[in-house]
Amino acid sequence: MDIRKAYLDFFASKGHEITPSSPLVPDDATLLFANAGMVPFKSIFTGEIPRPNPPRKTSCQTCIRAGGKHNDLDNVGYTARHHTFFEMLGNFSFGDYFKEQAIAYAWEFVTEVLKLPKDRLYVTVHENDDEAFNLWQKHIQKERIYKFGDKDNFWQMGDTGPCGPCSEIFYDQGEEHFNSSEDYMGGDGDRFLEIWNLVFMQYERSADGVLSPLPKPSIDTGMGLERVTAIKEGKFSNFDSSLFMPIINEISKLCNKTYIYESGASFRVIADHIRSSVFLLAQGVSFDKEGRGYVLRRILRRALRHGYLLGFKQAFMYKLVDIVCDLMGGHYTYLNEKKDFIKEQIRLEEERFLSTIENGIEIFNEELKNTKEIFSGEVAFKLYDTYGFPLDLTADMLREKNLKVDEEKFELLMNEQKARAKASWKGSGDKTASGDFKNLLEKFGENHFVGYEKAECESKILALLDEDFKEVSTLKDAGWVMLENTPFYATSGGQSADSGFIAKREVLDTQKFFNLNLSFVKAGEELKVGDIVHARIDTEKREQIARHHSATHLLHHALREILGSHVSQAGSLVESNKLRFDFTHHKALNKEELESIEKRVNEMIINSSEAILENMPLEEAKKSGAIALFNEKYQGNVRVLTLGESKELCGGTHVKNTAQIGSFYIVKESGVSAGVRRIEAVVSKAALEFVKNQLEELSKVKDELKNNDILNGVKKLKNEILSLKNELKNSSKTELDSKNIQGVEICVKRIDNGDIKAMIDDFKNKFAKAVILLIQVKDEKITLAAGVKDAPLKAGALVKEAAQILGGNGGGRDDFATAGGKDLSKINEALKQSLETIEKAL
């Protein structure tokens, strides 16, 4: 049974509009990831945006709980129902139906669609919610309805705002399968399993804690797909269901080990974590050192450590991407489009970590011998800083030994590192708007953007705010103006804001707060609320912004055409004199690729394609082939821009014909983070300025070379430099002192100049048997290298021992190895220890 489809179809038949899952990265600064079904509708529940039409929605929302307030990462694999990635089925009413219909719908779906036995179902309500208690008695015996307090049956979004009692449906998995003393309704056992939560949002909680009835109460429900699938299939663990077992079977095949539930935590961790990794990468999150990208890295590295326990010593996670796409690509079709890109990203990240995991585990095990209860915070930090072990990975390894890590010491060292990194940084931070925009929204509604059609207009001033966002009736100083109709485009979707004039006041910026367009003006003549003023934009700036914005669409199309369909927008900045476009791709672009992209964009410009703008429902737009961005929030009808072969959802300002863009030049290509590249480019007047500057630079080079043939002049210079380098290399060879032990020539020394590898090679060539270790310091950076020739030592082990004394690490072949170090104060100690090691071996 396709429960996901059955659920959505059921509520569609009850007048609910099916809403596609919103991005895992929400348009909400308070959330790391979408972690519940109601996240896309939060602004509706809080009144920030008007109620939709129809006021009933249903969805299957993809969710991540790994990091932030809601973090299930540590429990995944060890319990039957915790996941980092899951799907939440939900139905929502925004001031439409309330408790009676919500309860009736839930009961009908559970008993008639899912066909769960009624004698296995129980219900809970809030102890003071007599209305829900009485309504439930129409469907289920009174004895099966339990009352609980705020802890279990009251839901609120935050300390203030919409809230209300909730009612939960439980499923009895059978007394015969469970024997815990907690296996009763309200207990912590696993026998009675909550499958659906119905939230009755009927109150508004004020800052002083007072509950006031909402004029139009709402419904928010959530049912975990993984949990209800396991119940429907008669499984006691989500991991035993058809959503996970194909992945677990594939892991079993790859490692040639049989999966047994009781000892299969590592299988379950990997099966869960590959799902979250695939979805996060598909939606534009990339591996990084901070933020969401670091959560993704933590998830994958935790899975790799469990893979190590199963015997995987080489990259393997990327081989599981196919089975995830097979299982879920039918509903989430974008997975198939990004499959190859996802596999490559995971493989590269695996190889990054696998190169250090063995050394890290070795250090972990050594410290474990000295640990009784608390694992050293210093060693945990070293594992993080040097070997890439996230703290929760170390904690997970310790959990298996019933030990804990000294998190306080770890955080102290982490903060010290951050302080050092920021020692030279000074700044005041962002000023936070403190105005009550919600009141303005309730008073006036959204003001109207007329800038698509008009560059100037007469408009009424609805509100004025000072620089601290406090409402004022008159304004002479700098501040914010809210016009009834505004031609000024607010910063949005990467496009920078318009500038211009309101009356005689210069507009420097326009921003959107709670869907209100507010323009920031310089100090000047007095403005009053209610004034009718003339507003006009800087049309020259608008046109240049439009040219650069349209060019980003052509660039996006060219990237997908030349590099592959895995490319998606990961960020953009559009200004009047440049554009910046971030996109998903696993490696730097070569010269040929950049030339092809630049050429393709210019071809599309020359084709003189008319811009076609259409408004249509989101689903219709997607079916037409329009590209939607994962990090954008779309509601109701969307605006679709077609420029030749490019077709995207976009709310920005654009040219009427691609020919207006002029010419397109790529200025720079660079990396932003793992799996994300950036192209900076210019068009129109900025492109002409760029070419002019390039020609001027070439002219200066020609003058410096005193040669009209620039290319040959540069080649001649390069040959001269190479010749001088060789002379310097030969002149800098240092005569190395050595001594002979048992017929083996030994040299252990610090050097300041010369090519360290060349010196080791020269030393080994002079003698039949040789052992040499050199430490070189340049710009406070320590480099170690060792060489062995026909002697009972290994260069890799020798250099590793010395590097660890210096706070670094390294290795290599038995005959030659290199390493790096950090602690300059311990160089003599490292040299002494290395000499002792060599002498003992001989």
From Swiss-Prot:
It is found in: Cytoplasm. Zn(2+) binds at H549, H553, C650, H654. Signal peptide: none annotated. InterPro entries: aa-tRNA-synth_II/BPL/LPL (IPR045864), Ala-tRNA-lgiase_IIc (IPR002318), Ala-tRNA-ligase_IIc_anticod-bd (IPR018162), Ala-tRNA-synth_IIc_core (IPR018165), Ala-tRNA-synth_IIc_N (IPR018164), Ala-tRNA_ligase (IPR050058), Ala_tRNA_ligase_euk/bac (IPR023033), DHHA1_dom (IPR003156). The keyword tRNA-binding applies. It holds the Pfam family tRNA_SAD. It comes from the Bacteria. GO terms for molecular function: alanine-tRNA ligase activity; aminoacyl-tRNA deacylase activity; ATP binding; tRNA binding; zinc ion binding. One of its GO terms (cellular component) is cytosol. Keywords: Aminoacyl-tRNA synthetase, ATP-binding, Cytoplasm, Ligase, Metal-binding, Nucleotide-binding, Protein biosynthesis, RNA-binding, tRNA-binding, Zinc. Its EC number is 6.1.1.7. Binds 1 zinc ion per subunit. GO terms for biological process: alanyl-tRNA aminoacylation; negative regulation of DNA-templated transcription. Its main location: cytoplasm. Its cofactor is Zn(2+). PANTHER family: ALANINE--TRNA LIGASE, CYTOPLASMIC (PTHR11777:SF9), ALANYL-TRNA SYNTHETASE (PTHR11777). Consists of three domains; the N-terminal catalytic domain, the editing domain and the C-terminal C-Ala domain. The editing domain removes incorrectly charged amino acids, while the C-Ala domain, along with tRNA(Ala), serves as a bridge to cooperatively bring together the editing and aminoacylation centers thus stimulating deacylation of misacylated tRNAs. Catalyzes the attachment of alanine to tRNA(Ala) in a two-step reaction: alanine is first activated by ATP to form Ala-AMP and then transferred to the acceptor end of tRNA(Ala). Also edits incorrectly charged Ser-tRNA(Ala) and Gly-tRNA(Ala) via its editing domain. Belongs to the class-II aminoacyl-tRNA synthetase family. This is Alanine--tRNA ligase. It comes from Campylobacter jejuni subsp. jejuni serotype O:23/36 (strain 81-176).
